[in-house]
């Protein structure tokens, strides 16, 4: 195609992208001879979540464009496309030797490959590291938990639940509840209901065991819940009773954001002394 002919096709490609018609966009881009243009469109496609690209599509792109912008994002997404049914354990291990896992799921995929080769020491470290933060679908959660059952303990499930709660990934947290010890199940059920703005919050909080009533995460979720409903006095009640130290707060950055929002509301009400006290 000449430059004159390529221009309307490239415009057509962009139009397909804007409409999220990626199959048509990719076919359209293939008609353009300019390699840089085709590479750009492929890059845009591979960055979209839920695409139908295979691991091989990602692998080819990464190998040919190792200096491309946001290549680590592409590598991270590539990890989610690795499946033992399509790749041998050796090829997966070789890939990760050149491209160390960037996400929790990547570590789990590598652990799975090592498990096939009976290398349990490598499996244990990777699965414990990856389990906490991995982005796992509902179906994969059950699959991986069953597959790595002898390596994962209640403590590992608790670490994952705590991470998901602080990151406010409440649907993922809900799926984890059944794997937690009963007392922790009650704590994280209350947190999950608070952050997802679901019914039954008061009832769930009343069931939280006494030893967790002053849990930092629970207090944080209650604070946020009250603040979002404009309950400044109720929010203050929590802020004034908790320990304001890093060890207790767990995530001081999140607490600070809530404090600053509530402090602004107090300043607006001319309650300067109280605003000063909580900041």
Residue ranges and their predicted role:
Residues 12, 42-45, 78, 110, ...:
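Structural register within alpha-helical repeat arrays
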């Amino acid at each position: 195609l000449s430059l004159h002919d390529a221009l309307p096709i490239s415009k057509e490609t962009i139009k397909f992208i804007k409409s999220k018609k990626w199959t048509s966009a990719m076919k359209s881009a293939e008609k353009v001879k300019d390699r840089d243009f085709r590479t750009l469109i492929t890059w845009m496609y591979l960055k979209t979540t839920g695409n139908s690209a295979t691991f091989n599509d990602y692998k080819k792109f990464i190998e040919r464009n190792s200096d491309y912008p946001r290549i680590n994002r592409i590598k991270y997404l590539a990890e989610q496309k690795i499946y033992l049914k399509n790749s041998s354990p050796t090829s997966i291990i070789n890939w990760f030797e050149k491209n160390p896992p960037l996400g929790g799921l990547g570590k789990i995929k590598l652990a799975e490959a090592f498990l096939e080769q009976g290398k349990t020491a490598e499996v244990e470290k990777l699965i414990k590291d990856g389990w906490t933060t991995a982005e796992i679908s509902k179906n994969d959660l059950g699959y991986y938990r069953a597959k790595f059952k002898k390596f994962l303990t209640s403590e590992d499930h608790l670490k994952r639940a705590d991470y998901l709660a602080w990151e406010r990934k409440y649907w993922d947290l809900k799926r984890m509840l059944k794997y937690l010890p009963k007392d922790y199940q009650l704590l994280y059920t209350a947190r999950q209901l608070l952050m997802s703005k679901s019914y039954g919050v008061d009832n769930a909080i009343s069931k939280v065991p006494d030893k967790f009533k002053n849990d930092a995460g629970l207090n944080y979720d209650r604070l946020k819940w009250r603040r979002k409903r404009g309950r400044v006095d109720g929010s203050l009640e929590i802020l004034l009773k908790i320990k304001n130290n890093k060890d207790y707060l767990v995530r001081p950055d999140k607490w600070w954001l809530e404090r600053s929002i509530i402090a602004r509301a107090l300043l607006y009400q001319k309650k300067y002394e109280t605003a000063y006290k909580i900041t």
